[in-house]
């Protein structure tokens, strides 16, 4: 039985992975790492109780354990923590303007560059989340993986700032320029650094044309898969400007189903390209490098499957209806919500951090403003009564 009951149109989601050879795999350390990572991120109080409950239903630890199904326990925990960090930033930036998102991005990167430095009192919580995440990760991550992760995470945070700027301007990009930004906002590049978290892959491997092509195809498939699954909830709350479905509808003058179908065909082309290129995964004189290169390439293919499975198995996009949608591929288009999305915290985080003298000044200003507004309102009411 469908979870959604409505007179709204029904959308068919293309079965993009019908020919994908990677099966569903889950890391054997999932349950243990989920408990630890969920408790870890919850202790920061980054969300209100209501928002935290919704956050937990998304089960980002499941995404990590599906995507990094073959890393060891340390790698699984690093992956779970990273997914939780990603979505702390994601949830906060979704309701912030570009200026505020830039401030948060700078805090994150400062914590990555120097995780041994204590974070300032009263700072946005993401700084301490990042610092603790990276302190744990660098205990076992190889130097090459650390270097690539930090470089990729800078691209990611910068792109999220750009996404906020686009949202501030109500900008709808064209398909090409959208992909330029989306390839970083998806967070795949730093995630792929966790594929190699305990490997020692030289730069010449990562710069090999085959590996670069596989990485590019994988990123685009992740962008498409995420946008197809997230579109319904995003459009319902008016936050679909950074979604390929909206971009395609706008540029190609298609309806929702037409855009889904067009995007499905694009994904089919990427599947064909990836599988053909996968036959050419390079070998090297160093047997260990060849082994790790093959494992890295396998991990790219597994990421596509893992991300898709999580989209349906978690409650982030389809609530409890995900497994039916995975099989039947249909969803009812949700009606538009009138209210804006809630802040991650019940209170405004800026006001909650004010010292006593800040509160005094704020209340003084509000009292003055209220008195002035009340006088204006009284004058207008009197004028209306006289008229």
Swiss-Prot record:
Metal-binding among keywords: yes
GO molecular function: metal ion binding; terpene synthase activity
Enzyme type, top EC level: lyase
Chain positions recorded as Mg(2+) 1 binding sites: 90
Highest taxon of the lineage: Eukaryota
Residue sites binding Mg(2+) 2 per the record: 90
Signal peptide coordinates: none
Segments carrying motif DDXXD motif: 90-94
Positions contributing to Mg(2+) 3 binding: 226, 230, 234
Entry's Gene Ontology BP terms: isoprenoid biosynthetic process
InterPro entries, sorted: Isoprenoid_synthase_dom_sf (IPR008949), Terpene_cyclase-like_2 (IPR034686)
PANTHER family for this protein: BETA-PINACENE SYNTHASE-RELATED, TERPENE SYNTHASE
Domain observations: The DDXXD motif is important for the catalytic activity, presumably through binding to Mg(2+).
Protein name: Delta(6)-protoilludene synthase
Organism: Cyclocybe aegerita
Gene that produces this protein: Agr7
